[in-house]
Amino acid sequence: MCQIAGVSRSGFYSYMKSRNDKDSHLNRKEEQDKRDFDLILEAYSYKGYDKGSRGIRMRLLHMGIRMNRKKIIRLMRKYHLFCPIRKANPYRRITRALKSSNYADNLLERHFEDYGPGYVLLTDITYFFYGKERNKAYLSTIKDAFTKQILAYVLSESLEEDFVLETVNHLLRDHSGDIRTNAMIHSDQGCHYTCIRFIDLLKDRNIRQSMSRRGNCWDNAPQESFYGHAKDEIMKYVKEASSFEELEKIIDDYMDYYNSERYQYELSKLSPNEYLEYYKTGIYPLKDLVDENEKTIKKFDTVKANLKRLEEEKDQAAASME
């Protein structure tokens, strides 16, 4: 056969060996891809909440596994695993026609993280259609702008202002020791936040009120972002909820997951609770797997410098009054 083909016997066997080696390499690569994709699937569906490539990578890190994000994206495409696409918060349409004149100034001016935890608190409302009959429920939350923790939330069947007041009361009940002197609550210009009862509640508790400029969602961007991601991750369960009580359980479970295990790149790949602990202790829990983020270290240093300056200004003001 080699004579007919005009090739040497050694050349023929060398060719066959290289082809077998190539096939063997491809088989090994395919097997490795399958093993890696099994890990990706485990991370993707952890606690039942779908994740994108970044969320998967961060979950893998917390499982003690390093995997390049490019590989994760490649394998997701190869095996047709798609992450959810975020949707806009529809609450704006509810309150557009219900404005008042009790607007607060925009004290925040997008300085979300300058003074550490417990200083800037973001609040907003969104709604869900749940169950086959598409019943409507409303969710009010208060989020720490620095740690991204959800500090208080209330789910309601009614859009009456009471459930927004209840959200603030939950915050004061559960986190009174964590709220800093001169803290502010920042919201949009919705009717719930311009009502006299809400304004008086904040004044009674010495919490400053700040509001976004009209029609400018970027002034409350971290809160908007939370609702967008949350809806992507829980909507499949919300649609199947057969009662308001079942929806409450879905929201409760998600809030626990979000604060404890919903990792975020801007939080140095940590969950909100872990990020708060990292800020307090200076100990980075993933240091054996990834390097600490230099931007985060600088941010912590800036916050501490800002707090020191505030204390000095406070002392100077007190001394001038003596």
Model-derived features with residue positions:
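K/E-rich alpha-helical interaction surfaces of small helical-bundle regulatory domains
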Residues: 1-22, 250-270
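C-terminal domain-tail junction helix/linker
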Residues: 203-207, 229-322
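Generic alpha-helical secondary structure signal
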Residues: 7-11, 35, 163, 197, ...
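Mobile-element integrase/transposase regions
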Residues: 66-141, 166-170, 174-175, 180-181, ...
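RNase H-like two-metal-ion nuclease catalytic core shared by retroviral integrases
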Residues: 29, 94-95, 187-189, 195-199, ...
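Mobile genetic element proteins and their domesticated derivatives, centered on retroelements
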Residues: 2, 12, 40, 56, ...
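A short acidic/small-residue loop/turn micro-motif
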Residues: 144-145, 156-160
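Basic, flexible linker segments flanking DNA-binding modules
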Residues: 2, 13-115, 216, 272, ...
